[in-house]
């Protein structure tokens, strides 16, 4: 079976962010882009800087360009700064919140949990990672899935890497459940991104 972590490690180094816990060690050991000449790359153009920032944000939510563009279109219609609204829009995705709650270890695992029908919202199965969670929605692992190993690990806090749960979530890992108390504030969302550069990319 091929090592599925290697492409993500290489992608992490190219984007300058660790996309998985395993990538953190590689990134710390080699904090430069992949390739023989990674350490001596030329200064990027303004366009490339904006493109890279957009790709960094996309990668942290593991979404397609089409999904990103749709989220940006919705963010433009929201009140306040478009960049902040974009990040909040992405953070309300079901797979993103499953990750933040500590039920999953990575965004990739969170997506699989949703796609495979292990997650329910307000008592009904939801298998779309892009499902937008609303304040007061209750998300939990379905009863039939709770005995599976990944969820047993989550129940014991095995995926909780920093001990901090975002303030917009109320989490009960023992019950494998959480509630979105309110819309997230951009400053509370743990993603690495200069969202203004992303806005400039789409507004070009």
UniProtKB/Swiss-Prot annotation:
Pfam families: Ribosomal_S4, S4
Keyword annotations from UniProtKB, A to Z: Ribonucleoprotein, Ribosomal protein, RNA-binding, rRNA-binding
Residue ranges the record marks as coiled coil: none
Domain of life of the organism encoding this protein: Bacteria
Gene3D superfamilies xrefs: Ribosomal Protein S4 Delta 41, Chain A, domain 1, RNA-binding S4 domain
RNA-binding in keyword set: yes
GO term, biological process aspect, one: ribosomal small subunit biogenesis
GO cellular component annotations of the record: small ribosomal subunit
An example molecular function term from Gene Ontology annotations: rRNA binding
Keyword Membrane attached: no
S4 RNA-binding domain span: 92-156
Function: One of the primary rRNA binding proteins, it binds directly to 16S rRNA where it nucleates assembly of the body of the 30S subunit. With S5 and S12 plays an important role in translational accuracy.
Quaternary structure and interacting proteins, as annotated: Part of the 30S ribosomal subunit. Contacts protein S5. The interaction surface between S4 and S5 is involved in control of translational fidelity.
Family of this protein: Belongs to the universal ribosomal protein uS4 family.
Name of the molecule in the record: Small ribosomal subunit protein uS4
Naturally occurring in which organism (per UniProt): Streptomyces griseus subsp. griseus (strain JCM 4626 / CBS 651.72 / NBRC 13350 / KCC S-0626 / ISP 5235)
